[in-house]
Amino acid sequence: MDCPTRTLQTTGTWFTLAEQVVNQLQLNEEQLLGGGLHAAEHALIGLLPLVATCDRWDLGGLSLTQHPQTGLPTVFIYDGTPGGAGFSRHGFKQLETWLDLTYRQVNACPCKQGCPRCIHSPKCGNGNEMLSKSAGRDLLEFLLSSFGSAGTAA
């Protein structure tokens, strides 16, 4: 199928994982691609409305095991409106709260593999395939411990 390229000039926030982090978390390529990054992306989008005045439908996301510009596993959360609306920026400014709420929601959810309460998204272009709740939870826990209390911003 030949589809035209779509471009949206907007604002967003992202995180990358260095190789030593991937090794530390003992995630293999399949878990990253099929799971952890994608699950973390969905969970972060689902919980951003608790810290920014928006709806999950106002947001978009992308997760790649090797983004062409970063060269690293990368998750993007972006505003779904041209020019941005400030939602992802607000999430970045409230990073500790956003990460904490997201990690706690995924960790507390009683399901085993993922469900709409934790990592499934009603707007997933991949039909909520290739998700790993456990790898996503581990990534969120790592992000919270790395950025949460330190409030690191770049």
Regions flagged by a language model, labelled:
Residues M1-A154:
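Extended, highly charged accessory segments
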